[in-house]
């Protein structure tokens, strides 16, 4: 009989990378640069989001051999992406020992209706969310970590800011209703708007935050971007294309780690932001055709 990881164990792993940076890497050399820079973990994938966006086509789980090579090369946790709803890709990633599976909208969805039942796995999962409803639905499915979706591969933090603000505003509403004793409104919010069990709403009201670690992702390209998301209440950051699509990946990686850890110290952020070289070329969100937006995948 398969042994399933408990929510406590899965969420415990997520807390281990709290206040850290998870960096997208496509090979062993990049993984070693990330580890040397102080990354809390790496996300192993064959193409960073910026390349997926440009090249198009169907984006799938990466070659397990490439993931294993990266696992053998570094001592920090290694994560990998599965398509939304593709539970067999997730089974494969779990079988090769990835530390966390990202059920990711960056890849082409396999199921347009259902997400993976994450409670059926021992490996913990991270999922993206644009608002409190999406976040809590993924947690109800068994996600041990949430991240903003942002708009991956753009180098533009505006969507990540929008999504984090929406989550924060949703939490504030829940807490406000609870403090005013508006139980009927909370029940209606849970049932009709958020579509999650009341137990999750009660947990949010008590904690005044999500019950799992919440990272920023999507469009983070500079140390200041990382610090901005941390000041908004994120527990850490994912950086995809922003490091290895920049002019000086080694220096930028270290700078983003420093800024994430010292997010409330403007002098430190200013110092590490000096002489970073060219940032990745960004994309304005309003220039992206509606059908090319990744964040709308998987609600």
UniProtKB/Swiss-Prot annotation:
<dbReference type="GO" id="GO:0006520">
    <property type="term" value="P:amino acid metabolic process"/>
</dbReference>
<comment type="function">
    <text>Catalyzes the formation of pyridoxal 5'-phosphate from ribose 5-phosphate (RBP), glyceraldehyde 3-phosphate (G3P) and ammonia. The ammonia is provided by the PdxT subunit. Can also use ribulose 5-phosphate and dihydroxyacetone phosphate as substrates, resulting from enzyme-catalyzed isomerization of RBP and G3P, respectively.</text>
</comment>
<feature type="binding site">
    <location>
        <position position="153"/>
    </location>
    <ligand>
        <name>D-ribose 5-phosphate</name>
    </ligand>
</feature>
<dbReference type="GO" id="GO:0008615">
    <property type="term" value="P:pyridoxine biosynthetic process"/>
</dbReference>
<dbReference type="InterPro" id="IPR011060">
    <property type="entry name" value="RibuloseP-bd_barrel"/>
</dbReference>
<dbReference type="GO" id="GO:0036381">
    <property type="term" value="F:pyridoxal 5'-phosphate synthase (glutamine hydrolysing) activity"/>
</dbReference>
<dbReference type="InterPro" id="IPR013785">
    <property type="entry name" value="Aldolase_TIM"/>
</dbReference>
<dbReference type="GO" id="GO:0042823">
    <property type="term" value="P:pyridoxal phosphate biosynthetic process"/>
</dbReference>
<dbReference type="InterPro" id="IPR001852">
    <property type="entry name" value="PdxS/SNZ"/>
</dbReference>
<feature type="active site" description="Schiff-base intermediate with D-ribose 5-phosphate">
    <location>
        <position position="81"/>
    </location>
</feature>
<keyword id="KW-0704">Schiff base</keyword>
<keyword id="KW-0663">Pyridoxal phosphate</keyword>
<dbReference type="Pfam" id="PF01680">
    <property type="entry name" value="SOR_SNZ"/>
</dbReference>
<feature type="binding site">
    <location>
        <position position="24"/>
    </location>
    <ligand>
        <name>D-ribose 5-phosphate</name>
    </ligand>
</feature>
<feature type="binding site">
    <location>
        <position position="165"/>
    </location>
    <ligand>
        <name>D-glyceraldehyde 3-phosphate</name>
    </ligand>
</feature>
<feature type="binding site">
    <location>
        <position position="219"/>
    </location>
    <ligand>
        <name>D-ribose 5-phosphate</name>
    </ligand>
</feature>
<comment type="subunit">
    <text>In the presence of PdxT, forms a dodecamer of heterodimers.</text>
</comment>
<comment type="pathway">
    <text>Cofactor biosynthesis; pyridoxal 5'-phosphate biosynthesis.</text>
</comment>
<keyword id="KW-0456">Lyase</keyword>
<feature type="binding site">
    <location>
        <begin position="240"/>
        <end position="241"/>
    </location>
    <ligand>
        <name>D-ribose 5-phosphate</name>
    </ligand>
</feature>
<dbReference type="InterPro" id="IPR033755">
    <property type="entry name" value="PdxS/SNZ_N"/>
</dbReference>
<comment type="similarity">
    <text>Belongs to the PdxS/SNZ family.</text>
</comment>
<protein>
    <recommendedName>
        <fullName>Pyridoxal 5'-phosphate synthase subunit PdxS</fullName>
        <ecNumber>4.3.3.6</ecNumber>
    </recommendedName>
</protein>
């Amino acid at each position: 009989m398969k042994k399933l990881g408990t929510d406590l164990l899965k969420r415990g792993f997520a807390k281990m990378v709290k206040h850290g940076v998870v960096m997208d890497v496509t090979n062993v050399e990049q993984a070693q640069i990330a580890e040397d820079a102080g990354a809390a973990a790496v996300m192993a994938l064959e193409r960073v989001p910026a390349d997926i966006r440009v090249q198009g086509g169907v984006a799938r789980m990466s070659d397990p051999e490439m993931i294993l090579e990266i696992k053998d090369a570094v001592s920090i946790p290694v994560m990998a992406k599965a398509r939304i709803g593709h539970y067999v890709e997730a089974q494969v990633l779990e079988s090769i020992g990835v530390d966390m599976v990202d059920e990711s909208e960056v890849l082409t969805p396999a199921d347009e209706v259902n997400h993976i039942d994450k409670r059926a796995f021992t490996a913990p999962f991270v999922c993206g969310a644009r608002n409190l409803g999406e976040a809590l639905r993924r947690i109800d499915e068994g996600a041990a970590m949430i991240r903003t979706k942002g708009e991956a591969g753009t180098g533009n933090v505006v969507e990540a800011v929008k999504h984090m603000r929406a989550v924060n505003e949703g939490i504030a509403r829940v807490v406000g209703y609870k403090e005013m004793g508006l139980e009927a409104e909370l029940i209606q919010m849970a049932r009709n708007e958020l579509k999650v069990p009341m137990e999750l709403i009660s947990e949010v009201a008590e904690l005044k935050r999500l019950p799992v670690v919440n990272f920023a992702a999507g469009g983070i390209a500079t140390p200041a971007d990382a610090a901005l998301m941390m000041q908004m209440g994120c527990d850490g950051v994912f950086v995809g294309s922003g490091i290895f699509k920049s002019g000086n990946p080694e220096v930028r990686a270290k700078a983003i780690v420093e800024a994430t850890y010292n997010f409330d110290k403007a002098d430190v952020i200013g110092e590490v932001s000096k002489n970073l070289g060219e940032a990745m070329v960004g994309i304005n969100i309003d220039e992206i055709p509606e059908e090319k937006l990744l964040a709308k995948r998987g609600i």
